[in-house]
Amino acid sequence: MQVLVDADACPAVIKDMLFRAARRAEICVTLVANQFLRTPPSPFIKAVQVPAGFDVADARIVELAEPGDLVITADIPLAAAVLDKGAHALDPRGNWFSRENIEERLSTRAMMDQLRSAGIDTGGPAPFSARDGKTFASQLDRFLARHGKP
């Protein structure tokens, strides 16, 4: 089991939590981004830089994902793709993507895209909060307790 991170938009506080978890649980955490990422020295942490381009990082994450892996992303289509491969998907706010909720999330995303295309301001997500970080940490700890190294 490895943790793959859609790192371009992942909050720094979440990356720091993942770095600590990698060392503590001795699991591989791979950050994928289209820019250089500084990571702490650890045999459990690595960064993969992909060329700039639409969904290039997402495609690499899908390519790397295997059944049972954990993918950290706020990207709904990416979450759907890794779920199709048997991986788990968690957003940086601690919300799980699942077979039960992914279709609804994709539909909502498509509707919001249509509204934006029509010139309607749909706003955006609320700013990342300390509560979001705590929720993420709790969900990550639970996942690692169930699926981490034996």
Swiss-Prot record:
InterPro entries: UPF0178 (IPR003791). Pfam families: DUF188. Belongs to the UPF0178 family. This is UPF0178 protein BceJ2315_16760. It comes from Burkholderia cenocepacia (strain ATCC BAA-245 / DSM 16553 / LMG 16656 / NCTC 13227 / J2315 / CF5610).
